Amino acid sequence: MTALVRAELLKLRTIRTTWALVAVSLGIALVLLGLQLRNAGLAETASLGTTASTRAILVAPGSAALVILVLGVLVATGELRHRTIGATFLVTPARGRVLLAKLLTAGLAGLGLSALGLLVTLVIAVPWLAANGVTADVVNRELILVALVTLAAGPLYAMLGLALGALVRNQTVAVVLGLLWFLVGEGLIGAMGLRWLMPWLPGGASRALARDITLPGLLPAWAGGLLLLTYVVALAVPAWWLLQRADVE
C-alpha cells in the first residue's frame, strides 16, 4: 500500500493542474486574510487582537475547501481521462487497493494543502499584527481547536472529491456536480423551506467542522467531521462496487 500511495503522489506532483490548484488555494486564503486584516474593527467585524479576529484569520485557509475538493476529483479521474488506468490495474490487479491508495493520497494532499495555507497565513499575519502593535494570542485552547479543524477540513474535502470523482468517473462532470452542489444546490434546499435539513448536508457538516458560530442549529464540530467522513464512505462504497465491474482500456 505504501508503494501505491507513493506512486499516486508522484503522479499528482507531475501534473501541472495540481500546482495551479495549489496556487489558487493559497491565493484565496491570502485574499481573505487581507480582507480580514483590512476590515478588522469596522462595522460588525471584530477588532484585531481579539479571539474572534484571530479565529477569522485562522479559518482563512479553509475558504479554499472547494479547490481541495477539485484536487480530490483530479486524483480520482486523472488516469481515467488520460486512459492510463489500465496500466495501473495491470500492475495492481486488486482494484480496491488502487482506490484505497487514491483515497489516502487525496487525504494526504488535502492535509498538505491545508497545512501550507495555515502556515502561510500565520507567517504573514503574525508579523503584520506585531508591526501594528497588536499581540494576537494564537495559543489559547479555542484557537488551537480552530487551527486543528482547519487542518482536518482539507483531507476530508479531498477525500470527498476523490469519492465523487471515482463514482462519476468523468472529471468535468464530477467537478461541475461538486461545485454546483456546494455553491447552488444546498442554498436552493434552504430556500425551499427545508432549512432543518441544512445541518445534515455536506455544507452544513463543513460549517459545523469550522465551528461557525454565526449559524444556529449546527452539529458539534466533531459530529460535523464525522458526518463528512460518512459522506465520503457513502460515495466511495458504490464507487468501489462499480470499479470492480467496469471495463477499462
What is each model feature region?
Residues 1-26, 169:
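Aromatic- and glycine-rich beta-strand/loop motifs that create alpha-glucan
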Residues 11, 77, 88-90, 161, ...:
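Helix-capping/transition residues at the boundaries of transmembrane alpha-helices
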Residues 17, 94-96, 170-172:
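Membrane-helix interface segments
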Residues 18-74, 99-168, 207-230, 234:
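Secretory targeting signals
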Residues 31-34, 171-207:
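Transmembrane helix segments
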Residues 70-91, 96:
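Transmembrane helix boundary and interhelical loop/hinge segments in multi-pass membrane proteins
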Residues 76-81, 114, 156-158, 171-172, ...:
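Transmembrane alpha-helices and adjacent helix-loop boundaries
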Residues 227-249:
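Junction motif at the cytosolic side of a transmembrane helix
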